[in-house]
Amino acid sequence: MPLSYQHFRKLLLLDDEAGPLEEELPRLADEGLNHRVAEDLNLGNPNVDIPWTHKVGNFTGLYSSTVPVFNPEWQTPSFPDIHLQEDIVDRCEQFVGPLTVNERRRLKLVMPARFYPKVTKYLPLDKGIKPYYPEHVVNHYFQTRHYLHTLWKAGILYKRESTHSASFCGSPYSWEQDLQHGRLVIQTSKRHGDKSFCPQSPGILPRSSVGPCIQSQLRKSRLGPQPTQGQLAGRPQGGSGSIRARVHPSPWGTVGVEPSGSGHTHICASSSSSCLHQSAVRTAAYSLISTSKGHSSSGHAVELHHFPPNSSRSQSQGPVPSCWWLQFRNSKPCSEYCLCHIVNLIDDWGPCAEHGEHRIRTPRTPARVTGGVFLVDKNPHNTTESRLVVDFSQFSRGNTRVSWPKFAVPNLQSLTNLLSSNLSWLSLDVSAAFYHLPLHPAAMPHLLVGSSGLSRYVARLSSNSRIINHQHGTMQDLHNSCSRNLYVSLMLLYKTYGRKLHLYSHPIILGFRKIPMGVGLSPFLLAQFTSALCSVVRRAFPHCLAFSYMDDVVLGAKSVQHLESLYAAVTNFLLSLGXHLNPHKTKRWGYSLNFMGYVIGSWGTLPQEHIVQKIKLCFRKLPVNRPIDWKVCQRIVGLLGFAAPFTQCGYPALKPLYACIQAKQAFTFSPTYKAFLRQQYLNLYPVARQRPGLCQVFADATPTGWGLAIGHQRMRGTFVSPLPIHTAELLAACFARSRSGAKLIGTDNSVVLSRKYTSFPWLLGCAANWILRGTSFVYVPSALNPADDPSRGRLGLYRPLLRLPYRPTTGRTSLYAVSPSVPSHLPDRVHFASPLHVAWRPP
């Protein structure tokens, strides 16, 4: 007869009318009983003959393709001009006095962040934008391009201008300026002619610098003043002779994809005085001088015909405008859906490429990408805005994978010990937190995103046209991409983007200037950065609490008025460092804080309501007596595991599920096991914070017997049959708890100390978890354990009771930094009337 739920509860001693613990509990350690119960609950036999269930409610297998939904109305979020101040360490020191070694080290990690992959695999540009939405190819292409353009404009990306140079917008950092003579200068190869490289020229020359500045630049160069200099610096807009007249002026010569046909004449693009011994036109097109507003340079009309058709359509704008988009202007319409109808809508489509305000030399950057991008909803609650997903998973795969640094995340108990208090809470929202942290330009060649341009993208995805790799002179090839779908999409997009359609239809390669989200290094760096800032804030306001996990920052203070003034001070401090906060998203929580999926109040911690609802839904949809795919079980265990510490039996209750996942077997829920779990998760108990105290109760065991020391009382007992030592120690701890009711127990067994009961026999683990819930353990060396003698059957010998103080842990999260004395020359910080006379320390 299968085991009923009531009987099972009784077996686990979850009901009050159980017999004496010393008799009942050791029985649960019996292997035979555990096997019989497992068989009764149908836990151990995978029914292979029934097909597996692959979906339970919203849970599908871990690798299932849950298709993201494309939204043609997505708004691209705006990115404020995020610029973290470079002298962040000095600013923090002005705020709080000398920084601790820990804080300084963490802030140095992100100014600038560095990234050293072992191997970087370069992918063709076609893979730049992932064809995630086959129904909305063109729309997705333009939305993604617009998103990337927005990021570039906000100073978050570099734009590759040529193999060795990149441009960007926003304020430059010092390491972006001394790249010329820093270690990053890659010696130009022989075919590039080393002589022309000018070491004195600064890495950045803003576009606004005109004439005189350039002349002085040239005088400094070791080539000396050249005859071309006057002619170049003083030429009016649109100067360089006959070639210039026929082209669209673009302020810089080299664009996204470098022409593969360039010979030895194109010398390192950004050194300001390079190639002065060459023709004026070519110098204007290639050297940095062309950034000045005095004369905008053109593409390389001279070598137009050596380019393969797709590598650099973008910049060859000579007598035949070989820009794919503009070529439609002179062609005959092939049908009513021909693209030339769109191109002829306006005369001025703007430049083929835009260039940043600053330009730097970079290590060699191929015309490739290293990761693909696509768009998804910003989050489940906000489907109007899009979010860019960057896939740099190549760095986490294979045997060349980068092992990302590990960092401490507080566990549930540490978090409760720290934050469970009677403070008022408020949480800050850092907008685009990852994009605050600058990356060293040397990392740019490893983190490239981009696209091959609209023509390639459409050609690759449409079945009827082929990518033509030979010369594409004929108009027929040009019109290969015309189709009704493309025409309709572009007409609709024209309303949104206007003449930007032209700009976005060109190939582009962008590298990250701030840390991207798709790299395992980023969470680590963000955690280091915010925890260092919180440490500084905690030392500046010792009677308050500031704590962060990634971009989630919470502030706590004794009263609401106090909290508001703290909020004002901290906000101003963070703004002065260049951090961007989102004031609309500041949440005031009162006395119960919502953080990391938990609700934390003075009573302890519970999971947030939406997680409780998810669990209820999961049990409603859970099928009985049907084998469930182990990948779906992973999802179920992930959800239940989060709330397990709040249940009676905790993680041990989920052990059968874990075992199945490890064996990659399907799992079948019997009605009793499902009812048991459901009951467990319907009544959640808060995890309370641990209190410091003195340990008065000690437990010890040998394989054959147990002993307790409760105050001056000693007790002992024997087991019916010898047990493994860990099991015996666990039983002794349970007896100590049930006999004395003490919340602090001394033990010399490390497994019991760890409070992880999943390695014990299943039934015993479940029962012990409930008996020992809320108990704290203190380690006592065996030699000093007063319960050692009773456990060996000797009651006559009394060891003196130890004075064992217990201090709850707050984990390795460097939460509380003791403030160093403030040097005398700093003005005394003015304290508002604090509700506390003494500095408050975390509990």
From Swiss-Prot:
Q: Region (Spacer): which ranges?
A: 178-346
PROSITE patterns, from UniProt? RT_POL
SUPFAM superfamilies documented for this protein: DNA/RNA polymerases
Q: Name one GO molecular function term.
A: DNA-directed DNA polymerase activity
**Stretches the record annotates as Disordered:** 219-258, 297-316
EC number(s) reported in the record: 2.7.7.7, 2.7.7.49, 3.1.26.4
The source's superkingdom equals Viruses
Question: Per the record, which residues fall in region Terminal protein domain (TP)?
Answer: 1-177
Q: Which UniProt keywords apply?
A: DNA replication, DNA-binding, DNA-directed DNA polymerase, Endonuclease, Host-virus interaction, Hydrolase, Inhibition of host innate immune response by virus, Inhibition of host RLR pathway by virus, Magnesium, Metal-binding, Multifunctional enzyme, Nuclease, Nucleotidyltransferase, RNA-directed DNA polymerase, Transferase, Viral immunoevasion
Residues binding Mg(2+) are 429, 551-552
Q: Where is this region: Polymerase/reverse transcriptase domain (RT)?
A: 347-690
Catalyzed reactions per annotation: DNA(n) + a 2'-deoxyribonucleoside 5'-triphosphate = DNA(n+1) + diphosphate; Endonucleolytic cleavage to 5'-phosphomonoester
Q: Which GO terms describe its biological process?
A: DNA replication; symbiont-mediated suppression of host innate immune response
Q: Where is the Reverse transcriptase domain?
A: 357-600
Q: Point out the annotated site residues (description: Priming of reverse-transcription by covalently linking the first nucleotide of the (-)DNA).
A: 63
Describe how its activity is regulated: Activated by host HSP70 and HSP40 in vitro to be able to bind the epsilon loop of the pgRNA. Because deletion of the RNase H region renders the protein partly chaperone-independent, the chaperones may be needed indirectly to relieve occlusion of the RNA-binding site by this domain. Inhibited by several reverse-transcriptase inhibitors: Lamivudine, Adefovir and Entecavir.
Q: What does this protein do?
A: Multifunctional enzyme that converts the viral RNA genome into dsDNA in viral cytoplasmic capsids. This enzyme displays a DNA polymerase activity that can copy either DNA or RNA templates, and a ribonuclease H (RNase H) activity that cleaves the RNA strand of RNA-DNA heteroduplexes in a partially processive 3'- to 5'-endonucleasic mode. Neo-synthesized pregenomic RNA (pgRNA) are encapsidated together with the P protein, and reverse-transcribed inside the nucleocapsid.
Which family is annotated? Belongs to the hepadnaviridae P protein family.
> Which PANTHER family does the annotation name?
PEPTIDASE A2 DOMAIN-CONTAINING PROTEIN-RELATED (PTHR33064:SF29), POL PROTEIN (PTHR33064)
Q: Domain notes, please? A: Terminal protein domain (TP) is hepadnavirus-specific. Spacer domain is highly variable and separates the TP and RT domains. Polymerase/reverse-transcriptase domain (RT) and ribonuclease H domain (RH) are similar to retrovirus reverse transcriptase/RNase H.
Q: Could you share any additional remarks the record makes about this protein? A: Hepadnaviral virions contain probably just one P protein molecule per particle.
The protein's name in its UniProt record: Protein P
State the species of origin: Hepatitis B virus genotype B1 (isolate Japan/Ry30/2002)
**What is this protein's gene name?**
P
